[in-house]
């Protein structure tokens, strides 16, 4: 049977039973609240096969709302200075989770095509997200100076980015907890937000299975 993993929309753990023994393979999961997908469901089992992307004690996440507040503050400051805010993140899951936490009153929200297509799937699945547009739909180019731009990491340094002029950029990932990872990305800001469980989350999930 399949059980919600809380990773992204539609993510699931797999429960298998044979000769009275129950095994669960988690796949990717997180325990933090996320309005864009069903929450992680602990499943009692004898053996739990867990992911461990961030399986070290240094990985401990902030409350998501604190991260959203930081992102909105960064966007608001950039908009006041007439600079677009370009936030690089994974197009599936992370982009939609960030969208759900944005203050759409600050300015327009532009999605790269890779994120826009998936965002529409989320909307069709009943997930409430703020209005987003493609950059090609923006008629008033002055609006770009106050925009939040959601783009996949692959867009960095591409010709697509040139239309935003003097922008400030950031990357949202659990890896941004590491100074070296922030430096290698070469962005102005790093926001620590992950769709994977942190160290306390991994321990909590494992304990909850009673494996």
What is each stretch, according to the model?
Residues 164-207:
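A C-terminal functional module that forms or caps the active site or interfaces directly
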Residues 34-36, 58-60, 117-127, 179-182:
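Short, charged, surface-exposed secondary-structure boundary motifs
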Residues 17, 40-42, 101-106, 126-127, ...:
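Short, solvent-exposed amphipathic alpha-helical segments in soluble enzyme
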Residues 1-88, 93, 100:
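His/Asp/Glu-rich metal-coordinating catalytic cores
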Residues 8, 27-29, 52-54, 90-92, ...:
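Active-site metal-binding loops of divalent metal-dependent hydrolases
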Residues 64-68, 131-133, 149-153, 170-174, ...:
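A general structural motif
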Residues 1-38, 80, 136-165, 178-182, ...:
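Core dinuclear metal-dependent hydrolase active-site scaffold
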Residues 68-85, 89-145, 150:
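Hard-cation-handling environments
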């Amino acid at each position: 049977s399949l059980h919600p993993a809380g990773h992204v929309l539609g993510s699931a753990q797999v429960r298998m039973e044979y000769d009275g023994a129950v095994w669960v393979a988690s796949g990717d999961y997180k325990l933090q609240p996320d309005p864009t997908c069903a929450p992680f469901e602990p499943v009692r089992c004898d053996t739990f096969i867990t992911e461990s992307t961030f399986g070290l004690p240094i990985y401990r996440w902030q409350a998501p709302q604190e991260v959203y507040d930081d992102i909105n503050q960064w966007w608001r400051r950039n908009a006041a200075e007439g600079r677009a805010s370009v936030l690089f993140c994974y197009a599936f899951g992370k982009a939609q989770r960030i969208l759900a936490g944005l203050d759409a009153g600050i300015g327009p929200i532009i999605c790269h095509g890779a994120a826009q297509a998936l965002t529409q799937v989320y909307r069709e699945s009943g997930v409430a997200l703020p209005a987003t547009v493609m950059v090609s739909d923006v008629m008033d180019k002055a609006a770009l100076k106050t925009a939040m731009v959601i783009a996949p990491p692959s867009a960095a340094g591409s010709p697509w980015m040139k239309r935003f002029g003097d922008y400030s950029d950031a990357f949202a990932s659990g890896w941004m907890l590491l100074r070296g990872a922030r430096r290698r990305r070469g962005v102005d800001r790093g926001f620590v937000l992950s769709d994977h469980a942190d160290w306390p989350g991994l321990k909590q999930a494992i304990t909850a299975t009673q494996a």
